Amino acid sequence: MKIHKTSSETALPNQKENQMNQIRLHVWGDYACFTRPEMKVERVSYDVITPSAARGILAAVHWKPAIRWVIDRIYVLKPIRFESVRRNELGGKISAGKVSGAMKRKSVADLYTLIEDDRQQRAATVLKDVAYVIEAHAVLTAKAGADETVTKHIEMFKRRAKKGQCFQQPCLGVREFPADFALIDEGEPLPPSALSESEANRDLGWMLHDIDFDHGNTPHFFRAEMKDGVIDVPPFYAEEVKA
């Protein structure tokens, strides 16, 4: 397994600086589905939110090309409960060839999918009644301007989160499962955990960490362990993160 280092994270982060620029976001919802990639036919969720899904939630609140969100820690607040449901999905998607043809014709007249003709009902094993606290920091990317600072973006995120603002509705894995969110201010206690001692400590197995977009969209995985309801997420370039 190869380990790649992304251009947005080219050096070890400064721990003290990360703590100063750290945010904590409480997210929750009725249902969630963080799909396991090894399940090809039916959707089956991981036991908890993945770092990539957590990053997507933060980016939905605030993101610019100048920054990348790095997930440090995930707090699991509610017991892991699964439910089997049936979801309507499309059997396919519009092909790249059709999109290219529409661009050349400068017309989208034929660029559509008839949902009623392509709808399929599929079983899914999803999570029910979930709540997490996402602890993260931001790093500057190669696209950051000379006047860009991490602190500026952290403050922008905090202002937007306090007001409930977002670029798009955050979701818990899939769009059908929206996420509610609330900023946890510095010094403010975390929401209470409903986990029992046995539920709070478990090996969650190999889990998707994130996608390496700089090296062929390669998925990277890490061995997730929950201790006292907390999952420490290793840095993307750490030795224990495998491609």
What residue spans do the PLM features occupy?
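Residue-level signal for secondary-structure boundary sites
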Residues: 33-35, 82, 142-144
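Glycine/small-residue-rich interface belts in oligomeric ring/scaffold proteins
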Residues: 39, 44-89
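Polybasic, lysine-rich low-complexity intrinsically disordered segments
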Residues: 2-6
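Internal, well-folded beta-alpha domain core
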Residues: 89-91, 99-243
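N-terminal, Lys/Arg- and Ser/Thr-rich interaction peptides
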Residues: 17-41, 225-227
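Short, Lys/Arg-enriched N-terminal segments with co-localized hydrophobic residues
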Residues: 9-19
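A short, structural micro-pattern
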Residues: 19, 68, 126-130
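Beta-strand elements of well-folded, non-transmembrane domains
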Residues: 27-31, 78, 134-142
